[in-house]
């Protein structure tokens, strides 16, 4: 029942508009808020030509004309009522899809990348795909959850790498390969409404200003953005995951502190059992069961979105095959092999190992420290350790740096000779 004005006629109120939208035989149950795209959808046939589910200006004209039959003429109030009704009737298409799946009990995750792309059937490949699928599921059920992993398929053109990710997204509108830059002011618009974002040929990472920008982008859990009809910006929690495809062997951005976010999986079309597009219907049915298997794991709660220590070690070994050459690290390693001194500092390495005549910028000394820290940790640099306190260097002043690790002297009777400092600390009367 619509409220009436004192002088007769229907009141032009938001509530009256809501009542019509909820009860009119054409409009009822047709307007819903899509929680994935954060747009309003029309989900029923409306009696006029439409090209997609998202509410358009043309749809608004037809709805306004329909509202006039009830004596409601305020476009502003109708628009407000539409947002209220849509919000009260929200849905999430990917959650609905995943919740409707029934797993047939056949394990496919461990085999899928070999079947379609000829990847190795090993534990790292299986674990990488499993974590990627679980991360994608968690992102839609818990938007903004922490998930930094990027599954990267590496192999020749025509193998079906992009097609795999497109079909994995289930619907084409849930997939995008349109992300070219990570510093795009409209990056939320690029991500909005998509589940799987492919970085084709790793263009976005290649265009990044630094490895820090890449790491920061992949680690983000939200974007702050104002969509057109809103007055204030709001946090938009990420619901997508990122995938990479490339045919370059040296695609991994150089990161001396570790590339844990990038999971390279080599593929070989010649080893694949089927091409993913040979029979698309069969491939889609297989992928439905991939997600069903992943949902079974997700619902059990018995999973982690990180690799075990053993798998992390296997990943680091795998990543070495895809690293860009670190020429500066090589120059520093070579310098230390021939160097006869007992101490070095970053300024010394900048000048003497890398051959620079100017003073280093802060980021350049930081890069040298990263090379030394990583080299000592991974065994590329042996016999050196960071000294605990800053020391004076003749040409470079007081600096923190590194010193040779000296073996303790052992006499013929097997006793270790103590330094004067060690003896004093132990209280011996010398």
Features from the language model and the residues they span:
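N-terminal nucleic-acid engagement/recognition segments and initiation subdomains in replication
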Residues: 1-108, 123-127, 358-363, 374, ...
């Amino acid at each position: 029942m619509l409220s009436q004005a004192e002088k007769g006629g229907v009141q032009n109120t938001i509530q009256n508009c809501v009542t019509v939208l909820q009860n009119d035989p054409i409009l009822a149950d047709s307007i819903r808020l899509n929680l994935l795209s954060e747009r309003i959808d029309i989900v029923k046939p409306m009696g006029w030509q439409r090209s997609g589910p998202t509410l358009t200006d043309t749809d608004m004209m037809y709805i306004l004309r329909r509202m006039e039959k009830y004596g409601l003429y305020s476009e502003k109030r109708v628009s407000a009522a539409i947002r209220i009704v849509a919000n009260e009737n929200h849905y999430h298409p990917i959650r609905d899809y995943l919740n409707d799946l029934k797993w047939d009990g056949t394990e496919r995750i461990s085999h899928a990348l070999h079947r379609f792309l000829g990847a190795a059937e090993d534990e790292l490949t299986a674990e990488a795909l499993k974590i990627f699928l679980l991360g994608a599921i968690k992102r839609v059920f818990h938007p903004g959850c922490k998930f930094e992993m990027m599954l990267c398929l590496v192999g020749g053109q025509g193998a079906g790498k992009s097609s795999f990710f497109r079909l994995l997204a289930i619907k084409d509108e849930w997939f995008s390969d349109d992300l070219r830059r990570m510093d795009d002011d409209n990056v939320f618009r690029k991500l909005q409404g998509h589940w799987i974002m492919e970085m084709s040929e790793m263009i976005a990472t290649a265009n990044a200003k630094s490895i820090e920008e890449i790491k920061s982008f992949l680690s983000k859990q939200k974007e702050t953005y104002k969509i057109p009809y809103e007055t204030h910006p709001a946090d938009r929690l990420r619901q997508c995951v990122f995938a990479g495809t490339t045919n370059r062997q040296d695609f991994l951005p150089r990161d001396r502190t570790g590339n844990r976010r990038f999971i390279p999986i080599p593929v070989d079309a010649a080893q694949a059992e089927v091409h993913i597009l040979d029979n698309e219907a069969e491939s889609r049915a297989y992928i439905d069961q991939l997600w069903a298997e992943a949902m079974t794991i997700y619902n059990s709660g018995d999973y982690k979105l990180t690799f075990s220590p053993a798998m992390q070690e296997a990943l680091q070994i795998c990543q070495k095959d895809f690293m860009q050459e670190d020429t500066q690290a090589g120059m520093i390693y070579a310098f230390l092999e021939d160097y006869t001194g007992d101490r070095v500092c970053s300024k010394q390495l900048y000048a003497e190992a890398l051959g620079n005549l100017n003073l280093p910028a802060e980021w350049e000394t930081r890069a040298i420290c990263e090379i030394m820290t990583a080299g000592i940790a991974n065994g590329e640099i042996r016999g050196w350790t960071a000294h605990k306190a800053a020391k004076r260097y003749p040409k470079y002043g007081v600096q923190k740096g590194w010193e040779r690790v000296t073996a303790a002297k052992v006499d013929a009777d097997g006793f270790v000779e103590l330094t004067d400092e060690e003896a004093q600390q132990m209280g011996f009367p010398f």
